[in-house]
Structures are given as structure tokens and as C-alpha cells.
Amino acid sequence: MAALLASQSCCYGGETARVTKAIGFSSSLENHFTGEATQCYGSKSKRFRIEMRQSELPSKVGINGRSVKMVPASEVVKRKDGVNGSAGKGVNGASLVSSRNINGAASTLVKAPKKTTESYLPPPVEGVRVLPSDEGFSWADENYSSLQRSIDVWSFVISLRIRILFDNSKWAYVGGFTEEKQKSRRRETASWLRESVLQLGPTFIKLGQLSSTRSDLFPREFVDELSKLQDRVPAFSPEKAKRFIEAELGAPISVMYKEFEEQPIAAASLGQVHRAVLHNGEKVVVKVQRPGLKKLFDIDLRNLKLIAEYFQKSESFGTNDWVGIYEECALILYQEIDYINEAKNADRFRRDFRNINWVRVPLVYWDYSAMKVLTLEYVPGVKINNLDALAARGFNRSRIASRAIEAYLIQILKTGFFHADPHPGNLAIDVDESIIYYDFGMMGEIKTFTRKRLLDLFYSVYEKDAKKVMQNLIDLEALQPTGDLSSVRRSVQFFLDNLLSQSPDQQQTLAAIGEDLFAISQDQPFRFPSTFTFVIRAFSTLEGIGYILDPEFSFVKVAAPYAQELLDLKQRQRSGTQLVQEIRKQADDARSSTLSMPYRVQRIEEFVKELDSGDLKLRVRVLESERAARKATILQMATMYTVLGGTLLNIGVTFSNQGSQLVANGSFIGAGIFMLLVLRSMQRVNKLDKFEKMI
């Protein structure tokens, strides 16, 4: 949503900040004054009075370069009556309210003209196409049919399922099956998937972006293609945006904003961003949600839940917890369209970095925000990957790259609250080389106990102890403790040996390490939580940005002080209470083993007695021969279905040409049934092939 904000740094370069005495929710208040309005707007907005009091909060610096004070919403009191119970005076959009000076004397501000010769806003942003309200995608219509939307969703799912089936079926390749042919066909399917997702709109665009972080669930070709997914759709009309803002905030645009730029500066599937100016001169951005989005999410997620439940029951989709994955995605999607939640995230993120002067977070204007409308401080900057603009301003790109990684390490290791989508569109650079963060709809939180387990995992990796690594992964619910885990232990040990035995010049990138982790998970019972994948993805993205900014960039050098701090902390803990706890735990384990020893000896004696008496029977089955025979039977049935289906198809064509439409239709239906049976047979063959690879 904030992708174009970063390109606006030059808009205010020579403009002088204007100091006004109009109403200011974040400006310095020297006077206690009241404002009255009688503008009637539907049932939501009646006559009201806004009363402001002098703030005692610490001063901060606003975007206009002047000292401001943050006034909480509790300082704003709305009343229907006048100051003394009398009717209030009316204002239009350009009017300023009546006020009282510091001595209590009443003073009236003169109504401003409706049109000014000089605007507070910079020139409009080009390149954002506005979609008229009566055109566009089917999902953009607020009155779309729920039934038609469900049909569109299921048509997409069935088409994707058929494509994947043919991609994975060896018999579907002309001239024989090869891995290169399969990869090429998968790339074509992935490209089709990306375009289809864009056509289906907001729900599927966001799900596609989430899926691009899950290399542990989806083929590499799909992940690579979905990572290119750009959330760019035409903006909806300014008239619709203004009506929506007025309905959500309960007052006309002109009462809330001194100026409101109709042309959006950014547009995405979930909404769009407009620039505006408050009556006190503060420049802000207004994030407006696309109308009807909640209804669309409800319909799509209801259908996707049915699909997830089908995947969960089907053996052909593996042992992944598809219902759990669906629930994670649904939670993330609903959080993204809750702008109150996003505002809270922004405030919390701002507090976390309040003592770090090289990180900037836009201020939230709570009195101009609601569930579907969010007003933020306008903080323009240079897009972090715009190398030409960075060079033109003489910025130190190496320092910027290091700061981007360091800020994320602080989020993961110290605050536990991190930005889950730090792509270049959500990161910009201020004039003092500070990093500006945008868009706080998708955030992640690492709870205290989870952070402790992650630290234990880090220590286990450092010690190259595969057994401890596995136990920590089980504690993190990233590894399912089912069956024999000896193969998992060997895979983990191999990964540790390769990771830690390299020289500094041979260190893998974070993206390569992440790919190795997810490659292991393809054949092992791993189930990485979404938080884990978000962290890996974010670090990979930031590392890529680091290499773009500075070819000599090294993640290891930036992270080394933090890693050393963690190791020092571990050593201090080992010398204290943790050492006592470990000794006590080992003593408990030894006592349990000693107490269970007689039972184990008894079981061994019983086994030996059965073996001596001949009561122990061993049953051996030739499994390979059985599987081969079963596969041959399935292929024979598939061949028979194909012949019968082809015969009925020919009969149908013949009778159709002769005018016997009833017989022809029956033949076509029969041919379709046999074709479905053929597909079912091929699916069973694929299951057998996968089973053979697992043993």
C-alpha cells in the first residue's frame, strides 16, 4: 500500500512549514479553545463541538519540522450542544472554528475562501490508474453474487488441480517423462496461477503472497513465481473513496481535512492511499479500505475452508495440517483489513524504536481513524532500492544496508514484535539516512517462551548437537515426533556439518540456508510455523536488499555482535541456576531409567522364552511384488476405461451427426464418466509411486 510513498521525498524540499492556530490534534496547543459545527451529515454526524485542552505530553518533531505534542483521543470531547448549552455556529469545509485565547476572551477566525491560490499539497502522483465505479473486475462490484463468486473460486481450484495432476503424471508427457520437462510445465502452471490469482482479487492475491513464503509446502517453481506477485490493481473512484471515508468517520471530508487529494498516490487490492492536509496544516496520508472487502473475504474463506478440509482428508496432499494452515492465513487476512489493529501495531512499533533515532515510524492520528479508514503522518522518503536517488543525495549505502538488518535483529531478538512484510515498497530512507517503515497490517509476534526456545535452538545449532536441535524443533512444534526419527537426525546433522564447517568466505546466504531447510522438510515430518517462515523470508529479503545496496555486504558481520551477546548470556546462565537445573534433570532421568530397568529385563526374558519354544512367528511378505501387481492391475483398468470412453465418444459423435441427439448425449456422458475413472486410476498410480519413494 505504501509502495509509492517512498518516491515523494522531493515534493516538500523547498516548501516552508506553515504554522496555524487552527485545530491541531498533534500540534502544539498554547490555547484552550473550543470549536463548533452544525454541519448535518446523515444520522451519524449531528451538531458537535470539539474541545481541546493544553497537552502536557513530551514534545516531538512533526513532519513539518516544528515541535508538536501528541494529544490522546481522551483530550477530545464531542458534544451536541454549544459551549453554554446554546446552538453552535455552522461551518463549511473551509471554515475554521471559533476559539478562545489564553486569557479566555472569545475570538472568531475568519472563514477561509473556498478556493486558494496556493495548495498545501504537492503535485498529484502520476501512474495510478483510477477505476471508474461501474467498471473493472467482477470482485470490485459491491453487489456481486455470492453464488457466482463461489463458482469462480471452485472453477479456479478445479482447473489448478487438473493442471497439477497432468504435471505430476508421467504418462501425460509426449515423448517420455524427464525432470526438465516437468520443471518446464510446472513453470507454465505457476505463471498461469499468478495471472489467475490477480484476476480473482484481494483474497487470492494475499494468499499468493503468503504462499510465496512457504517453500516447505509448495514446489519451488510455484514459490518463485508467486514471489513476483505484485499487489497492483486499479484504484477505485475518488467519489466512492470520499463517500466511504465520510460514512466511516461520520463527518464530511471538508470538516475533517483542510485539503484532500482525490488522486490516490498508491493503490492495491485491499485499498488505496490519498494525501490530505489537516486544518492545522499537518500533512497526512489517508488509507481507505476497498468497499465490500469483508463480504468478499467471508465468501472466499468459506470456500477455501472446504478445500482445506478436503486436502486434510486426502492422502495425495501429504500429511500437512491444511486446516491449521488455512486458519493461520484467515487470521492474517482479517487482521490486515482491521485498520484499528494496524494502528495499534504502528503505535507499538513506534514505542519499540523510540530510543533509536535512525528508525522512523509514522504517527497515527487516532481521531481521524476507524476500522476501515486510517490516517497517518505523511513521511516521504527515498525507496530503499532506488540506487540512483540514494546516490544523488549522497547517502551511505553500506550504512543503510547494515541498519536494515540491525533493525530487524532488534525486532526478533529484543522486542519480539516484527514487521512481517519488509519488502522495498515498505522501506524508505529519510534525509538523515533513517529507515522509514510503512504498512503495519502484517506483523508477527514472538512470545517470550517461543523466543526462549528459539535461543535454545540457536545454542544447539552452535554446538552442532543434532539431538538437541530436534528436541528444540519439537518444542517449537516445527517437527512432528512421529515414528522413527533417525533419518531426520541424519538430515539435521548433515545440515549442521555443512553450515558450520565453512570458512567465512564460503558462508551461505540466508536465502540459501532457508532453501536448504525447506528442502529437508520436503522429505521429513517438518511443519514450520508461519512465524518461522515469515522471519526466514524477511531476513532473505533484507539480505537481498543489502547486496543490492552494497556488493560487499555481509550479514555475518552485522549479526556477529548480537550472536556473541547471546553466547555470553548463555555462558553466564550456565554458571548459575541453569547448571543446577540441568544436573537435577539428569538425576531425574537416571532415576526413571533405574526404576524401569526390571520391567525391561522381564520383557527380554519373555521374548527369549517365546523364541526358544517356537511360539514366536515371523511373517514376511514380498511387498515389492505385491505393489507391482497392484500397479499393473490399476493400469489395466485405466486402459480399459480409456478404450470404453473413446468408443462412447465416437458413438456420440456419430449419432450427433445423424440427428439422434438423445443417444449422443448419453454417449457423451458415459465417455465423461470413463475419463474421470481414468484420472482416478492415474491418481492411484501416483500414490503408489510416492509410497515407493518414502520406503
Curated annotation (Swiss-Prot):
Its EC number is 2.7.11.1. The gene is ABC1K7. PANTHER family: CHAPERONE-ACTIVITY OF BC1 COMPLEX CABC1 -RELATED (PTHR10566), PROTEIN ACTIVITY OF BC1 COMPLEX KINASE 7, CHLOROPLASTIC (PTHR10566:SF113). GO terms for cellular component: chloroplast thylakoid membrane; plastoglobule. It is a multi-pass membrane protein. It catalyses: L-seryl-[protein] + ATP = O-phospho-L-seryl-[protein] + ADP + H(+); L-threonyl-[protein] + ATP = O-phospho-L-threonyl-[protein] + ADP + H(+). Mostly expressed in leaves and flowers, and, to a lower extent, in roots. This is Protein ACTIVITY OF BC1 COMPLEX KINASE 7, chloroplastic. The chain crosses the membrane at residues 633-653, 659-679. GO terms for biological process: cellular response to oxidative stress; membrane lipid biosynthetic process; regulation of response to reactive oxygen species; response to iron ion starvation; response to oxidative stress. It holds the Pfam family ABC1. Keywords: ATP-binding, Chloroplast, Kinase, Lipid metabolism, Membrane, Nucleotide-binding, Plastid, Stress response, Thylakoid, Transferase, Transit peptide, Transmembrane, Transmembrane helix. Induction: Down-regulated in response to iron deprivation. GO terms for molecular function: ATP binding; protein serine kinase activity; protein serine/threonine kinase activity. The active site is at D421 (proton acceptor). CDD domains: ABC1_ADCK3-like (cd05121). It comes from Arabidopsis thaliana (Mouse-ear cress). It is found in: Plastid, Chloroplast thylakoid membrane; Plastid, Chloroplast, Plastoglobule. Belongs to the protein kinase superfamily. ADCK protein kinase family. Disruption phenotype: Larger plastoglobules associated with thylakoids characterized by VTE1 accumulation and high tocopherol content. The pale green double mutant atsia1 atosa1 accumulates ferritin and superoxides, exhibits an increased nonphotochemical quenching (NPQ), and have a reduced tolerance to reactive oxygen species (ROS). Lower levels of the highly unsaturated lipid digalactosyldiacylglycerol (DGDG) and of different forms of monogalactosyldiacylglycerol (MGDG) and kaempferol. The abc1k7 abc1k8 double mutant accumulates strong levels of oxylipin-conjugated MGDG and DGDG. Residues 259-589 form the Protein kinase domain. Involved in resistance to oxidative stress. Influences responses to reactive oxygen species (ROS) production. Regulates plastoglobules formation in thylakoids. Together with OSA1, regulates iron distribution within the chloroplast and mediates the oxidative stress response. Together with ABC1K8, influences chloroplast lipid synthesis/accumulation and modulates chloroplast membrane composition in response to stress.
